[in-house]
Amino acid sequence: MATTTPPETKSAAWWNYFFLYDGSKVKGEGDPTRAGICYFYPPQTLLDQQELLCGQLAGVVRCLWDLSGTPPMLIRMRNLKFAIRADGDYLWALGCGVEISDASCRQFLDQLIGFFHFYMGPVSLAYKSHPQEELSLQWDTSITQVLRSTSESHRIFNALWNLDRTKVEPLLLLKAALILQTCQRSPHVLAGCILYKGLIVNSQLLPSLTAKVLLHQTVPADQRLPGAGAAPQETGAALPPDVQITSVFLSEEEVASLHEFPVEHETRLQGSSVQYPPWDQSSPTQAEDAWASAAIPEPTPHDGACPSGSGADERLPRLEQECAGPTGLCTTACGQGSGLSSRLQKELCLSREELDSSEMHVSEAQEAFPPLPALGDLETLHSSHSAPTLPEDTAICSCLHPCPLERLPESGRLGQLADLPLTNGQTQVPGTDPLPSSMPVALPPQHPVGVEPSVEPYGNGAQESHSALPRSSRSPDSPGPSPSADRTGFKPSPSGRHAGLVPMNLYTHSVNGLVLSLLAEETLLSDTAAIEEVYHSSLASLNGLEVHLKETLPRDEASLTSSTYNFLHYDRIQSVLSANLPLVTAPQDRRFLQAVNLMHSDFALLPMLYEMTIRNASTAVYACSSPAQETYFQQLAPTARSSGFPNPQDCAFSLAGKAKQKLLKHGVNLL
């Protein structure tokens, strides 16, 4: 839901038990079970009951793990269901009521574990470096905040609390987005979010990261998580007023997501570490031609069309000084977006006679710098030519012939060749003929920091190594190392799925009820100038945004106008809810939520399901689903015909049209 947070939950009948169990402390028959209990909720449970529950569940998990090779994720009982997570010797279990869906039960457990790892790091290291009482306070704080900020509708979707955007001027939302983009230009800052009284105004983070940041903001200052805010005192950094920097830990997947979208941030980092060549200082027309030539490959003449002679020879030493890397070799700008104009590219091309001689130099250079052996059964072709030793002041450049789209190999072949080293610029591919020795050779260019090379087949077998996108912006289908994100399998090792945690900094700046939260690299804490830049670049904008939000949002949220319909809209991308349900649900609203819970479970089990209508003798609920959203609608007005049999006059058949019409004013487009 939007607009406000619910009151503190007094009773949580749906949340029965939660515990963390360390099996490494209970190995023998004489070891007491209580020695392995790291944390148990509710804490007032008798110790004998804690031992009974932890021992029985740990035994069942270990038995199923040994039989199937994978620990169970959900254990059902008569009146309870337990979501299970295993990480080496550690076992987490969350017991919920049977009315909670299986997906929500597992999501709540993952959320709790994510909170702990975000603020305390890996659980194995946390329990070695912190006292158990301090970590128990961390668990108490996380559980309290989850129960306090969870309504009946949020228990179904496990969604975040967001600001009702229909009650806020769009320019204010745009201003919040511009503030975050401005902060991204500062050093070390990756992404962030802006919150107002515990509600999301704008966020660049994943929903899981936003939920962790929300937990930090909702905890009072005197009850902050252990270790929060201790980093500035340890390093002696002087922070601006109302600013706090907390050490946090992110998974490798979350760090990769922070590097995907901020193009300006990536450009800034590369620009600070790469020296641009002098020819970038060209006229606007030449710069546009350079970008066009880099983006659209032009056909290269074959028979001596590339200019050669004194003019080209005079430019080679200059190019060697500007582009030569550690190996002293230079490549053309073919396939790179380095800003070279088409005129310079043509001047760097060699004739066929020069290519033959340069190919002999390549083999000599490879003998001086032997590459790694090729993997698999692919046979590497080595040139049999011999030539004098390559002088140090010689630059070798070559251009590849254009490859039409119809000659490109299949995508599967790309994955097989991506990890092969370049030996002579030629690699024999199974099922193809070797390239003749007179074919042009392309050498791998030098790559700036944070950019890794990728190899793609070019033509019938020649490969061109060119600059790829940064690691963070790699497409999901591209080959390369990727962190494990499997939620269904857990390896029985101490490392587990949360072992690859990366330390980061959480920068928070509070302006009354408005909070700016930024995730930055660990080096931000030691860079006082960067902290001052972030603070001063956003201070005035945050003050203005806070004043406008205070004047725009309605102050009395309790006086909600009665409506003739109920609706609930769930954004799957941002994991937020929009609804017109009251904070205190009536019996009729509970029946609506029961129907929503049932249909949401069906949508999760049947991804191809698009629409459904569920009804009883008195009312009907319409639902539609897409990969991006779920929408539920109920008409509350009494109808003349509402029998349980299909009838053209039945209200259930008109719900789809009414939902599309009435939800437009709430910003929900079902057309």
Swiss-Prot record:
<keyword id="KW-0344">Guanine-nucleotide releasing factor</keyword>
<comment type="subunit">
    <text>Component of the biogenesis of lysosome-related organelles complex-3 (or BLOC-3), a heterodimer of HPS1 and HPS4. HPS4 and the BLOC-3 complex interact with the GTP-bound form of RAB9B but not with the GDP-bound form of RAB9B. HPS4 and the BLOC-3 complex interact with the GTP-bound form of RAB9A but not with the GDP-bound form of RAB9A. HPS4 does not interact RAB4A and RAB7A.</text>
</comment>
<comment type="function">
    <text>Component of the BLOC-3 complex, a complex that acts as a guanine exchange factor (GEF) for RAB32 and RAB38, promotes the exchange of GDP to GTP, converting them from an inactive GDP-bound form into an active GTP-bound form. The BLOC-3 complex plays an important role in the control of melanin production and melanosome biogenesis and promotes the membrane localization of RAB32 and RAB38.</text>
</comment>
<dbReference type="Pfam" id="PF19033">
    <property type="entry name" value="Intu_longin_3"/>
</dbReference>
<protein>
    <recommendedName>
        <fullName>BLOC-3 complex member HPS4</fullName>
    </recommendedName>
</protein>
<dbReference type="GO" id="GO:0030318">
    <property type="term" value="P:melanocyte differentiation"/>
</dbReference>
<dbReference type="InterPro" id="IPR043987">
    <property type="entry name" value="CCZ1/INTU/HSP4_longin_1"/>
</dbReference>
<dbReference type="GO" id="GO:0016192">
    <property type="term" value="P:vesicle-mediated transport"/>
</dbReference>
<dbReference type="GO" id="GO:0007596">
    <property type="term" value="P:blood coagulation"/>
</dbReference>
<keyword id="KW-0015">Albinism</keyword>
<dbReference type="GO" id="GO:0060155">
    <property type="term" value="P:platelet dense granule organization"/>
</dbReference>
<dbReference type="GO" id="GO:0042470">
    <property type="term" value="C:melanosome"/>
</dbReference>
<feature type="region of interest" description="Disordered">
    <location>
        <begin position="269"/>
        <end position="291"/>
    </location>
</feature>
<dbReference type="GO" id="GO:0042803">
    <property type="term" value="F:protein homodimerization activity"/>
</dbReference>
<dbReference type="GO" id="GO:0031267">
    <property type="term" value="F:small GTPase binding"/>
</dbReference>
<dbReference type="GO" id="GO:0006605">
    <property type="term" value="P:protein targeting"/>
</dbReference>
<dbReference type="GO" id="GO:0007040">
    <property type="term" value="P:lysosome organization"/>
</dbReference>
<dbReference type="InterPro" id="IPR026091">
    <property type="entry name" value="HPS4"/>
</dbReference>
<dbReference type="GO" id="GO:0016020">
    <property type="term" value="C:membrane"/>
</dbReference>
<dbReference type="GO" id="GO:0005764">
    <property type="term" value="C:lysosome"/>
</dbReference>
<feature type="compositionally biased region" description="Low complexity">
    <location>
        <begin position="467"/>
        <end position="477"/>
    </location>
</feature>
<dbReference type="Pfam" id="PF19031">
    <property type="entry name" value="Intu_longin_1"/>
</dbReference>
<keyword id="KW-0225">Disease variant</keyword>
<dbReference type="GO" id="GO:0005085">
    <property type="term" value="F:guanyl-nucleotide exchange factor activity"/>
</dbReference>
<feature type="compositionally biased region" description="Polar residues">
    <location>
        <begin position="269"/>
        <end position="286"/>
    </location>
</feature>
<dbReference type="GO" id="GO:0046983">
    <property type="term" value="F:protein dimerization activity"/>
</dbReference>
<dbReference type="GO" id="GO:1903232">
    <property type="term" value="P:melanosome assembly"/>
</dbReference>
<dbReference type="GO" id="GO:0042827">
    <property type="term" value="C:platelet dense granule"/>
</dbReference>
<dbReference type="GO" id="GO:0050821">
    <property type="term" value="P:protein stabilization"/>
</dbReference>
<dbReference type="GO" id="GO:0031085">
    <property type="term" value="C:BLOC-3 complex"/>
</dbReference>
<dbReference type="GO" id="GO:0031410">
    <property type="term" value="C:cytoplasmic vesicle"/>
</dbReference>
<feature type="region of interest" description="Disordered">
    <location>
        <begin position="417"/>
        <end position="497"/>
    </location>
</feature>
<dbReference type="GO" id="GO:0005737">
    <property type="term" value="C:cytoplasm"/>
</dbReference>
<dbReference type="InterPro" id="IPR043989">
    <property type="entry name" value="CCZ1/INTU/HSP4_longin_3"/>
</dbReference>
<dbReference type="GO" id="GO:0046907">
    <property type="term" value="P:intracellular transport"/>
</dbReference>
